[in-house]
């Protein structure tokens, strides 16, 4: 990440070292958070893919979130069979951008952390509910990918009256898994 200040980069390096980050291991940031229910993919799905990253890729996983969003992380951790890296807390935005610049890949819900990961220049995979992925995924380079599902009502969505939120809850785990594998193979491994 060439755009972060030397101070922010030093902070990120010190933070990663303090939680046991190991050079040569796949570094993955995961953000299963959003304050909008139509952007929250189920915790058990994040847990399944997080376990896969740890077990089959030897990844070191860092859950990132903002103030008041810890409960999203705890919900995912409860469903996991493996331990992610220790919590890195809530750095400020510039420190978070520097931290993301140290990651190999980012995956998560459509949220601000994904935008920071894109700005940090790392490959991203976004999981989209109500908003159209094409509106929020940078055009061109394939290092930023997205997965979405349309149950037939995305264009005419009546949220908050919508009670099923199928557009995010039913995004297929296997489809996200395949997109994550392809992104890793194309840009990281």
For each of these PLM feature ranges, what is it?
Residues 42-129:
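Donor-binding and catalytic core of enzymes assembling or modifying cell-surface/extracellular glycoconjugates
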Residues 1-38:
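Mid-sequence helix-capping/hinge segment at a functional interface
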Residues 36-37, 70-71, 133-134, 153:
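Flexible, glycine-rich phosphate/dinucleotide-binding loops
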Residues 5-6, 92-96, 152-155:
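A short acidic, often aromatic-flanked loop/helix-cap motif at beta-alpha or helix-coil junctions
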Residues 23, 101, 142:
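Structured loop/turn residues at beta-strand edges in well-structured enzyme cores
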Residues 6, 43, 170-174:
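Electropositive phosphate-/nucleotide-binding environments in soluble metabolic enzymes
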Residues 87, 115-189:
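Nucleotide-sugar donor-binding patch of glycosyltransferase catalytic domains
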């Amino acid at each position: 990440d060439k755009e972060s200040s030397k101070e922010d980069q030093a902070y990120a390096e010190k933070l990663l070292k303090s939680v046991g980050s190991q050079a040569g291991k796949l570094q993955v940031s995961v953000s299963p958070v959003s304050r909008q229910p139509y952007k929250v993919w189920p915790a058990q799905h994040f847990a399944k893919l997080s376990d896969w990253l740890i077990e089959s890729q030897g990844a070191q996983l860092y859950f990132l979130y903002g103030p008041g969003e810890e409960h999203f992380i705890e919900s995912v951790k409860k469903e996991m069979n493996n331990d992610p890296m220790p919590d890195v807390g809530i750095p400020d935005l510039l420190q978070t951008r520097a931290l993301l610049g140290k990651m190999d890949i980012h995956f998560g819900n459509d949220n601000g952390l994904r935008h920071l990961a894109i700005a940090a220049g790392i490959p991203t995979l976004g999981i989209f509910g109500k908003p159209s992925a094409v509106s929020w995924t940078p055009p061109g380079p394939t290092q930023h990918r997205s997965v979405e599902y349309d149950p037939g009502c995305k264009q005419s969505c009546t949220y908050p009256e919508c009670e099923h939120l199928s557009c995010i809850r039913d995004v297929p785990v296997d489809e996200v898994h395949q997109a994550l594998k392809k992104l890793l193979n194309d840009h990281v491994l």
